[in-house]
Regions:
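A short glycine-rich, His/Asp/Glu-containing loop-to-beta-strand
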Residues: 83-103
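A short beta-strand-loop-beta hairpin characteristic of the jelly-roll/cupin
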Residues: 120-140
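A short hydrophobic beta-strand segment most commonly corresponding to one strand
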Residues: 117-120, 144-146, 160-175
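Non-heme Fe(II)/2-oxoglutarate
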Residues: 1-88
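Short, conserved beta-strand element in jelly-roll/cupin
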Residues: 100-101, 111-127
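Short beta-strand His + acidic residue motifs that chelate non-heme Fe in jelly-roll/DSBH
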Residues: 107-109, 127-129, 138, 147-160, ...
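Short loop/turn positions at the edges of beta-strands in beta-sheet-rich folds
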Residues: 113, 121-123, 133, 149, ...
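Short, flexible surface segments
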Residues: 103, 140-141
Length: 175
């Protein structure tokens, strides 16, 4: 199965509010948020509390080559995200990021080394996760989904004017 629901009743509006208040509206992210062609990736967990939450995941492009495992990304970078961090802890997630896909964009078709947990926070009917050439719509209805991203996949935001925001991480036991 490509996608399965693993948790319900997550207050995604509360997560959205926390992310908007403490993360997305930070001055350091405004250039990226204002660029209509750039998808934004913000780390919520890092290898240490001093890790830069925006550039951390990109500078460690090949985590294994740098001597780290994905499980090493387990330190909360935004301790003020009380509810969001409690959901991350409840799902035993690590290397959790906020992924914002701008309108009329997609990422390259790729496969990840592990399955990913997706919690859609802000989405619309024109957003899809293509897995192995099948389009799936993940609803922002308070569910956490385990997605088999070890298969070739890409997120697509075919909206004309709305961002797609997902909380994405991993769980050792579910990968």
């Amino acid at each position: 199965m490509d996608i399965e629901t693993i948790k319900d009743n997550i207050d995604t509006e509360r997560i959205y509010t926390e992310l908007q208040t403490f993360v997305v509206n930070e001055d350091q992210f405004q250039d990226q948020m204002d660029d209509s062609h750039l998808s934004v990736q913000i780390c919520l967990q890092g290898i240490n509390a001093e890790m830069d939450p925006y550039f951390g995941s990109r500078t460690l492009k090949h985590i294994a080559d740098e001597g780290f495992k994905e499980e090493d990304f387990n330190i909360f970078l935004f301790p003020e995200l009380d509810y969001t961090n409690s959901i991350i802890e409840d799902l035993l997630m690590f290397r959790t990021r906020v992924m914002i896909l701008k309108p009329k964009t997609c990422l390259s078709y790729h496969a990840d080394p592990r399955k990913r947990i997706h919690i859609p926070i802000d989405t619309n009917e024109n957003c899809f996760l293509m897995i192995d050439q099948y389009a799936h719509h993940l609803f922002a209805n308070g569910s956490a989904y385990l997605c088999d991203t070890t298969k070739p996949h890409t997120p697509i935001n075919a909206s004309l004017d709305s961002n797609r925001m997902h909380l994405i991480g991993m769980n050792q036991q579910l990968s």
